[in-house]
A protein has these predicted regions:
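Bacterial N-terminal signal peptides that target proteins for export
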Residues: 1-9
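Bacterial N-terminal signal peptides
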Residues: 8-17
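Active-site microenvironments that recognize anionic phosphate/pyrophosphate groups
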Residues: 20
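Transmembrane beta-barrel domains of Gram-negative outer membranes and organellar outer membranes
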Residues: 23-252
């Protein structure tokens, strides 16, 4: 059974990486409703981390692979090499939790009106990371978000939120909400800002809220740099004194 699951993951990765892209979402926590175009691919090779008073944790290197399997439908695979470095203790490195998702845009944006595009993006996080080392949740989680976007060239705004099902001892279900406003500065550069809020995911844990500033830079038609940096503005020392995301995106 495990061998069959392994073959399935490898086949999914091959589909994402080898298929013949362009599209928002990363580098921000909030996503957008726009799927990768049909039969095209978007691969983000990323690193990210969050620092708190207790230490630093994140992804040393990860793959966020997206494929337009049908018009208005996108499949996503996220595979991270995670780390957890508590202050005053040994650091842990290893494979983290794997995420599978499907995005379906059920409403297109009106070009001459105010109506936005809207999509659902259900996600399943499989507990492939070692929870005892802080590299995974230890249980299967599901996320059920709705994302909205409207373009006002050269401005773009998107965001939304959803509900995380987070089972396990000491865990609790929680909500995430976020919104982004960004502007195209040049043909190559877009800059923006994000605000977000997340309720506590563990019993006795505090809610978190914060902001990120960042954007994208197009090196050429196929290669793009994605970047953000930010921090919490709610329970900051416990949840997020500094965080970053940096990625090389390949679209084809």
């Amino acid at each position: 059974m495990l061998r069959k699951i392994g073959y399935f993951v490898i086949m999914c990765a091959a589909l994402f990486l080898l298929a013949p892209s362009a599209h928002a979402g990363p580098p921000f926590l909030s996503d957008d409703p726009e799927p990768v175009p049909y039969q095209r691919t978007e691969n983000d090779f990323f690193t990210s981390a969050t620092h708190t008073k207790d230490g630093t944790a994140g992804t040393v290197m990860g793959l966020d692979a997206n494929y337009g399997v049908w018009p208005d439908v996108e499949l996503t695979l996220i595979a991270p090499l995670a780390f957890n470095a508590p202050d005053g203790s040994n650091a842990f490195f290893g494979y983290g939790d794997t995420q599978f998702a499907i995005k379906y845009r059920f409403l297109d944006e009106s070009d001459d009106g105010w109506w936005p595009q809207i999509a659902i993006y259900p996600t399943v996080s499989v507990p492939t990371g070692k929870a005892s080392h802080g590299l995974g949740a230890g249980n299967t989680q599901e996320f059920f978000p709705v994302w909205v976007q409207k373009d006002f060239d050269p401005w773009q705004t998107f965001g939304g939120g959803g509900y995380w099902n987070n089972p396990g001892a000491g865990h609790q279900n929680y909500w995430f909400f976020g919104w982004v406003l960004q502007r195209k500065i040049t043909e190559e550069l877009a800059l923006g800002g994000e605000i977000f809020h997340q309720t506590a995911s563990l019993e006795g844990e505090k809610d978190t809220g914060g902001f990120n500033l960042g954007g994208t830079y197009d090196l050429d038609e196929n290669y793009h740099i994605l970047f953000t940096a930010g921090r919490g503005i709610q329970n900051t020392s416990d949840t997020n004194t500094f965080s970053y995301y940096l990625a090389l995106q390949l679209t084809y």
